[in-house]
């Protein structure tokens, strides 16, 4: 039987991510596993088509986004620890979400990724793309997709 010991749970703070966190917490509790919550803040671009943001403003916006994400992650961890007796750590990274998730999975030797999916199909999925789908295709470990 598969018994993961280190579970990577990417979150974007959506309802789907909350479901994935709850599922991962149940799995962790049953297997005495550690949960690693990860949020990736998209790296802000300084320039758009015809406008550039001053670098100081961009850096402040990026820092504010990271601080807010860390605050939300601390809240998520507290919610988990109120109902489960499991080991939970977290981090906030800046970059391309699917790439950072895959990098963290390899670096931390995760043996399971539990990720929420919005469930879009058809043209919406094609236009918007799916972090969960990219993670599923590229991951070297099992991925549990939670809807």
Annotate each predicted stretch with a short phrase.
Residues 1-2, 30, 78-113:
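Structural beta-alpha unit
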Residues 2-55:
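Small/aliphatic-rich secondary-structure junction motif
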Residues 25, 78, 133:
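Active-site phosphate/pyrophosphate- and oxyanion-stabilizing loops and adjacent acidic/basic residues
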Residues 38, 89-93, 144:
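General small-molecule cofactor/ligand-binding pocket signal
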Residues 45, 98-100, 122:
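Generic structural signal for helix capping and beta-alpha/helix-loop junctions
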Residues 56-71:
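A short acidic, glycine-rich active-site loop
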Residues 68, 92-96, 118:
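Short beta->alpha linker loops
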Residues 103-147:
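Gly/Ser-rich helix-loop-strand patches that form or flank binding pockets
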């Amino acid at each position: 039987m598969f018994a993961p010991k280190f579970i990577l749970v990417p979150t974007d703070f959506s309802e789907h991510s909350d479901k994935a966190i709850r599922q991962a917490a149940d799995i962790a509790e049953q297997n005495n596993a550690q949960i690693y919550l990860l949020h990736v803040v998209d790296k802000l671009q300084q320039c758009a088509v015809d406008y550039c943001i001053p670098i100081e403003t961009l850096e402040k916006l990026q820092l504010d986004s990271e601080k807010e994400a860390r605050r939300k992650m601390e809240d998520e961890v507290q919610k988990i620890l109120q109902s489960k007796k499991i080991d939970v750590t977290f981090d906030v990274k800046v970059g391309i979400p699917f790439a950072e998730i895959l990098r963290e999975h390899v670096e931390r030797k995760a043996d399971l990724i539990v990720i929420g999916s919005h469930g879009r199909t058809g043209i919406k999925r094609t236009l918007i793309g799916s972090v969960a789908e990219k993670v599923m295709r590229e991951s070297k470990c099992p991925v549990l997709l939670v809807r």
